[in-house]
Amino acid sequence: MASPTLKLNSGYDMPQVGFGLWKVDNAVCADTVYNAIKAGYRLFDGACDYGNEKECGEGVARAIKDGLVKREDLFIVSKLWQTFHDEDKVEPITRRQLADWQIDYFDLFLVHFPAALEYVDPSVRYPPGWFYDGKSEVRWSKTTTLQQTWGAMERLVDKGLARSIGVSNYQAQSVYDALIYARIKPATLQIEHHPYLQQPDLVSLAQTEGIVVTAYSSFGPTGFMELDMPRAKSVAPLMDSPVIKALADKHRRTPAQVLLRWATQRGIAVIPKTSRPEVMAQNLDNTSFDLDSEDLAKIADMDLNIRFNKPTNYFSANKLYLFG
């Protein structure tokens, strides 16, 4: 089945249900993308930092060559990493990422985090990661502001390298600031969003301003448990939640479908991933039923304001308090 779409403020239609590419292993990434296209996915959410964009591009190229899709049928999303925030570095790295994907433009290109770090040349290390030395040294840029970076992002649109641009992991004040200085308004805001971290005020702000919200990590701690993260292990998996399981039984759906529908029913886009064809189909088919007001209220009561995707949860990073 095809995903419903959401209209962006840039005028383009974005599939509401896409396929996330974080932690998709390089060895299987091309096949995973190809199989997801066969299953009906059209939006693919990647990033420089995921380290698998070449393989993603191979999967896309094979699907186009085999006649499964045309380029214009796909909606390819990628992100600008923090070490490339300098105005003169944005376009060159975008062109490199486009080359990895074997495409001429991104449908959507995002600022990955609201943090400008010192430049690391791709010939030294790519993806560069968080640390300047590749080990432990954090070096904030002393010259580059988010406004300057956004100006360079806008020029990507002017040059046809990106059709829409957006932001990721921004909190409310950064969104407010962007709305003041932006010539081209952010089309989307991608955030960690699940029943344990609902961020209702941030979601409301974005939607009120005509910015589409995309939820990542819709299944909460599950993806972070694989990283042996203590914070993720401190709470029960959402798939095992009695509330979510009861709603899945009530609607004769899987817990994953309930978690995804909780977002999509509220106008939020989702980007789940899986390597299993049957689960690919289930995740894509999450908009064919509705949760009632009582269901939504029960999930709203699950909010713990627990964030998993922040640097201080991965490593000792006392200079990387991005969500303070």
Curated annotation (Swiss-Prot):
Pathway, per UniProt? Carbohydrate metabolism; D-xylose degradation; Carbohydrate degradation; L-arabinose degradation via L-arabinitol; D-xylulose 5-phosphate from L-arabinose (fungal route): step 1/5
Protein name as annotated: NAD(P)H-dependent D-xylose reductase xyl1
- Catalytic reaction annotation: an alditol + NAD(+) = an aldose + NADH + H(+); an alditol + NADP(+) = an aldose + NADPH + H(+); xylitol + NAD(+) = D-xylose + NADH + H(+); xylitol + NADP(+) = D-xylose + NADPH + H(+)
Upper lineage: Eukaryota, Fungi, Dikarya, Ascomycota, Pezizomycotina
Q: What is its EC number?
A: 1.1.1.-
What's this protein's family per the entry? Belongs to the aldo/keto reductase family.
Q: Which residues of the sequence carry a binding annotation for substrate?
A: H112
Show which residues form the site (Lowers pKa of active site Tyr): K79
The source's superkingdom equals: Eukaryota
Q: What induces it?
A: Regulated by carbon source. Most abundant during growth on D-xylose and L-arabinose.
Q: Which UniProt keywords apply?
A: Carbohydrate metabolism, NAD, NADP, Oxidoreductase, Xylose metabolism
User: Which regions form coiled coils?
Assistant: none
Which example biological process does GO assign this protein? D-xylose catabolic process
Residues binding NAD(+) are 168-169, 217-226, 273-283
Q: Which residues form the active site?
A: Y50
Q: Name one GO molecular function term.
A: D-xylose reductase (NADPH) activity
Gene name as annotated: xyl1
Q: What does this protein do?
A: Catalyzes the initial reaction in the xylose utilization pathway by reducing D-xylose into xylitol. Xylose is a major component of hemicelluloses such as xylan. Most fungi utilize D-xylose via three enzymatic reactions, xylose reductase (XR), xylitol dehydrogenase (XDH), and xylulokinase, to form xylulose 5-phosphate, which enters pentose phosphate pathway. Also major aldose reductase in pentose and D-galactose catabolism. Reduces the pentose L-arabinose and the hexose D-galactose to their respective polyols.
Q: Which InterPro entries does this chain map to?
A: AKR, AKR2D, Aldo/ket_reductase_CS, NADP_OxRdtase_dom, NADP_OxRdtase_dom_sf
